[in-house]
Amino acid sequence: ALPSLRGKEKGMMHRDISINQKEIRRMEDTMTATVLNEAEVICATTIGCGHRLLESRKFPIVLMDEATQASEPSSLVPIVKGCRQLILVGDHQQLPPTVISRKAESGGLNRSLFERLIACGLDSMMLTTQYRMHPVLREFPSARFYENRLEDGCTPDQRPPPAGFLWPDWDHPMAFIPVAGAEEVDEEGKSRSNRDEAAKVLGIVDALLAMGDITADGIGVVAPYNGQVRLLSQLFDEAGGREAGQPYGGLEIKSVDGYQGREKDVIVFSTVRANDAGEVGFLSDYRRLNVAITRAKRGLIVLGHPTTLRHDPNWRAYLDWAEERGLFAWHMTNQ
């Protein structure tokens, strides 16, 4: 053991350890290089393409998935490594890159290369067939955000609404539940929550699980504010827990931004905002609305304060669409 060694013996031991560590690193680098040399495709994040293990490698073909989530500087990392053909896949009608700094965001860092190229008029190809949503759930986003170009790759029979929730129309598995509660601002004034909506979300999930037509891992709970995500997480943890083997095991509670690219059989969306001034905050970003209402496969349940939400034109259009089809779940308001 090193502590028992003295003088020259200790120095020699340190030298041997250093030599062995260098040899281990050399062997690891050799094995990694061998794997990379034999690989026809290398998968990495945009920033990961700048790792030292890839610094001498060229990528003549770059395929960037979720390209609208990548900032322009990060997109350049793989492109400058010998790219001759660039394929960008993404949806500029959904959320842009996440930028923490407001100053950087206002300076344009939240604009993706994908969005810039579209704005410049570069020819693009749109994949128009969606395989996720019940056809009814596709209707509004297609009309509002995609010029009515979306088509369905699944039928209503393949996306039956789950039992356990009294849908206003069983042929239209979408429901808007008016909630009269008020939003709360956290102590730091940086996030918001809504206890009335959170309590209703818990009741809705309990009812869905009680019928056995869906399991907890098939349900996604979504909110626009981290304050509401924390409140919901606390409620479900206190009610039994979300770990494996617990009553809500597998239930995911995330922000809208955290659900981009994800899907669940049922999405329960708590909109949080409820105030006399009609302020909706960053719910006013139509891309956030688009992401939230396009995650569900079999059913979508939205909770919110209609008077507040109608101050925003996109939310007003969405609520009008739901109301015209009789999808306001007034029977759930007082439960």
Name these PLM-found stretches:
Residues 1-61, 74:
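Conserved helicase NTPase catalytic core signature
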Residues 47-335:
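Conserved helicase motor core of SF1/SF2 NTP-dependent helicases
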